[in-house]
């Protein structure tokens, strides 16, 4: 099947945008300027209590961060999105909480600062949908968080992506997917430049990427051996 992209849908710098996908459709997230972190959340379109869960995803994949072929799973442990293509260096994050108003207060802001937590609702409200609760556990696309050699300490670093780098996520169920072009301009995460948040772009693809199959959950080897 050929890739039929929709016109680019811009996530304005520091703001949110959401899309509804049918199972088998894909969304491409484009780092237009090469420096922007994009937070991502997803929900079952028919049950907003079922949401994409980073904790359950790490158990399912046994990866700290996703690679092509990995699925993100929900709070009910069902695959919801699968990473089917990645033209970036593959540096993303599933650990850091999305920024919220309180985060910026702790960083010294005395006035309201745009944040990913509010952007989640901004994007979904454009679709007429209100998630039942806030979820700080986002998939942080293009964010560069490194585990240091002591295997304990995390380092928050600038992005290593290039202009036009992208990832593509395939919907495994009908779902809402929300994105935030992260407004963070205090902690240096937005590339090696002036840390200014920038636009990112989305494209909806009518392509199921059939060569990328959904993998089952990780199971300890002694259990898989016993089943043979």
Question: Language-model features: where?
Answer:
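Acidic, Ser/Thr/Pro
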Residues: 1-228
């Amino acid at each position: 099947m050929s890739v039929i992209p929709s016109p680019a849908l811009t996530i304005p710098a520091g703001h949110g945008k959401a899309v509804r996908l049918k199972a088998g459709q894909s969304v491409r997230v484009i780092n237009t300027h090469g420096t922007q972190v994009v937070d991502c959340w997803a929900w079952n379109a028919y049950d907003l209590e079922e949401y994409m869960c980073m904790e359950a995803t790490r158990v399912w994949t046994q990866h700290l961060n996703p690679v092509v072929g990995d699925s993100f799973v929900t709070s009910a442990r069902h695959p919801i999105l699968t990473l089917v293509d990645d033209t970036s260096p593959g540096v993303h994050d599933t650990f850091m909480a999305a920024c919220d108003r309180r985060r910026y207060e702790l960083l010294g802001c005395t006035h309201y600062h745009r944040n990913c937590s509010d952007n989640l609702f901004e994007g979904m409200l454009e679709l007429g949908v209100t998630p039942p609760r806030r979820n700080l556990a986002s998939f942080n696309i293009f964010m560069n968080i490194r585990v240091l050699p002591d295997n304990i300490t995390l380092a928050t670093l600038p992005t290593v992506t290039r202009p036009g780098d992208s990832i593509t996520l395939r919907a495994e169920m009908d779902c809402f997917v929300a994105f935030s072009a992260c407004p963070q301009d205090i902690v240096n995460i937005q590339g090696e430049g002036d840390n200014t948040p920038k636009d990112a772009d989305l494209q909806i693809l009518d392509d199921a990427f059939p060569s990328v199959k959904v993998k089952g959950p990780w199971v300890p080897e002694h259990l898989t051996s016993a089943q043979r």
